[in-house]
Amino acid sequence: MTTESNAYRGLAWVAAMALFMQSLDATILNTALPAISSDLHKPAFEMQMAIIAYSLAVALFIPLTAWAAAKFGTLTVFRSAVFTFILGSVACAAASNLESLILARVIQGIGGAFMMPVARLAIIQAVPKQQLVNAWNLMATAGLIGPILGPILGGWLVIHASWHWIFLINIPIGALGILASGSVMNNIKGKAEKLDWTGFLLFALGLVGITLGLDLLGESQHNSSVTYSILVVGILLLVTYCGYAKNNENAILPLSLFRTRTFRLGIIANIFIRLSASGVPFLLPLMFQLSFGYSAEMSGWLLAPIALISVMLKILIGRILNRWGYKTTLISSALLMAGSVISMAWLDKQSSLTWIICNLMWYGACMSIIFTSINTLAVGDLSKQQSGTGSTVLSIVQQVGIGFGIAVSSIILNLYRHFFSASDCLPQAFSYTFLTSSLFVIALVWSLMKLHKHDGDHLRKMP
């Protein structure tokens, strides 16, 4: 029994290493962007695709994970995914221009897309139900630590080593995961269903077109007719996918899920949350370093409280939902989140560090509550047969939303930068960007108002 328990714990540790590496990577890059842009001879305001490319690659390849694991086996796919992630990390460190960095981030994202879903699948297949909670908790802890350490470690490495090390640190962690997985993870295969390649290509190319179009829209040096053409083609491809998948239950992302009202509203709300607030972790390091004159290390320490308060608040969210219900909690959190983003518009280099930290903790608390609430509500009414696909769609929307949120924030910031053309007007450009981004909360609250008072009651412990 002890040997079996150790084997399950070992599998959880391997999954935890992968999740730690991935969650660390999600936040470590932001504080290093100004340093990277300087080395690559690109304006820091044009570096957003280095972040967006990763999120987009993850979103595109998540739908293939179950098929790949069934066809090739969990161990084979997991090791290949970690190796791909390491390969992408090395390529990032070796990048000599923005284009090569973006390509390397895509490689990283492909590895990241397969890494965690397959690790979770391996745990579900191998760990007995009575030990499943312990395995999840161990893995989740690593996922919570990564975002806290990411900004701090990223800033420290930029100052005391070089930005290349924010990618190179993945090599020992990933190598350990590859070696350890051989002794604790079985190569379990299954029946690989026929993959919907038509749907995958329509969906993938549509997302790439929209994301690339939005990115080019924020860069004035590109031909506007080409930019709008790419954007329109991307939208048309996604519309075509919707028509294709409407009556096709075997589509890679079946639209029948959207017949469930709470799932539909949860997806819509997720998009508006990302548009209103996901650009904040991208904008803040730029503002701290380029406008306030803070070092990368100071910037990293200031960003850490966002993740820290988010983790600390997790234990209270259940009580909040039990007391107030989903609709009231979500609308209140959305309005408070808007307030936190608006208040960032009044931050300047004279602002006290105490006020800045309080402001960012306010933002982190709201984001923690709203994401946990909307994500549990979105999948809460799905049937057991739909829950796996529903979780996949939710993960895709979250990654796409991050990319869209950063792209839109970048567009808004660049518009204000060109409007306030004087070099000393950069603080105003950031202020107006935060104010404009907060307007998406109007659409968010509109979508949340469509929830019913008792939605999610079956997920609560009623007082």
UniProtKB/Swiss-Prot annotation:
Pfam families recorded: MFS_1
SUPFAM superfamilies: MFS general substrate transporter
Keywords, in A-Z order: Cell inner membrane, Cell membrane, Membrane, Transmembrane, Transmembrane helix, Transport
Membrane topology: Multi-pass membrane protein
Gene Ontology molecular function, alphabetical: transmembrane transporter activity
Example GO BP: transmembrane transport
Sequence intervals crossing the membrane: 10-30, 49-69, 82-102, 107-127, 139-159, 165-185, 197-217, 225-245, 267-287, 298-318, 328-348, 354-374, 393-413, 429-449
InterPro entries, alphabetized: EmrB-like, MFS, MFS_dom, MFS_trans_sf
Subcellular location: Cell inner membrane
Coiled coil feature spans: none
This protein's GO CC annotations: plasma membrane
Domain of life: Bacteria
UniProt key word Cell membrane: yes
Family of this protein: Belongs to the major facilitator superfamily. EmrB family.
Protein name stated in the entry: Probable transport protein HsrA
Native source species: Haemophilus influenzae (strain ATCC 51907 / DSM 11121 / KW20 / Rd)
Source organism phylogeny: Bacteria, Pseudomonadati, Pseudomonadota, Gammaproteobacteria, Pasteurellales
